[in-house]
């Protein structure tokens, strides 16, 4: 018989740096999950991702207090900021441009995020990532 799902917990945790402090501890503690067990499993699974990159994770908590989790790719905005070498996007993206990314970098980010995006093909995903870049005040160069 399948286990009964008690809750879904969505968090963004720095890759390889999960620890019991907020936001992980309180969110999982409320559900009765063994926090250290999650932290060890998450850190082991995210070893291949650059340490410190915020990684979305969806944790499925079952009624017997066991859990499973699925990691997603880092948010597009974080990958774009890293590619452009900036700390934050523009407060006025239509007026103030804060950096540049090449279309090759945008395509690479789209291919990285392909598993999590709902676009029908790579070109649609590239356009979506380019739109995110423009809304952050980045210029997309050919």
Swiss-Prot record:
Cell division keyword on record: no
Keywords associated with the record: Methylation, Ribonucleoprotein, Ribosomal protein, RNA-binding, rRNA-binding
Pfam family, one: Ribosomal_L11
Signal peptide: none
Post-translation changes: One or more lysine residues are methylated.
GO terms, biological process: translation
Keyword rRNA-binding: yes
Top-level taxon of origin: Bacteria
CDD domains found in the cross-reference section: Ribosomal_L11
GO molecular function: large ribosomal subunit rRNA binding; structural constituent of ribosome
Entry's Gene Ontology cellular component terms: cytosolic large ribosomal subunit
Subunit structure: Part of the ribosomal stalk of the 50S ribosomal subunit. Interacts with L10 and the large rRNA to form the base of the stalk. L10 forms an elongated spine to which L12 dimers bind in a sequential fashion forming a multimeric L10(L12)X complex.
Listed PANTHER family: 60S RIBOSOMAL PROTEIN L12 (PTHR11661), LARGE RIBOSOMAL SUBUNIT PROTEIN UL11M (PTHR11661:SF1)
Family: Belongs to the universal ribosomal protein uL11 family.
Function: Forms part of the ribosomal stalk which helps the ribosome interact with GTP-bound translation factors.
Protein name as it appears in the record: Large ribosomal subunit protein uL11
